[in-house]
Amino acid sequence: MRCVPVFVILLLLIASAPSVDVQLKTKDDVPLASFHANVKRTLQILLNKRCCQVMPQCCEWN
């Protein structure tokens, strides 16, 4: 009989505890589209640098 109040209190505490479903975003949670855009931009920069060394007329002047 003494355990019943303790059991009820524990149940109330567990029910009022915050949920662990919410997770913070980490730096690894980058959207895939953003990753592809970064890769495309980096490859374009490298291509432009290489092209400018071989043929200066194909350089993009922004």
UniProtKB/Swiss-Prot annotation:
Residue ranges annotated as propeptide are 20-48
Q: Which Pfam families match?
A: Chi-conotoxin
Gene Ontology molecular function: toxin activity
Record InterPro entries: T-conotoxin
What tissues contain this protein?
A: Expressed by the venom duct.
In the UniProt record, the signal sequence range is 1-19
Q: Where in the cell is it found?
A: Secreted
* Principal location listed in the UniProt entry: secreted
Q: Could you say which protein family the record assigns here?
A: Belongs to the conotoxin T superfamily.
From the Swiss-Prot or TrEMBL record, give the protein name. Conotoxin mr5.4a
Q: Which organism is it from?
A: Conus marmoreus (Marble cone)
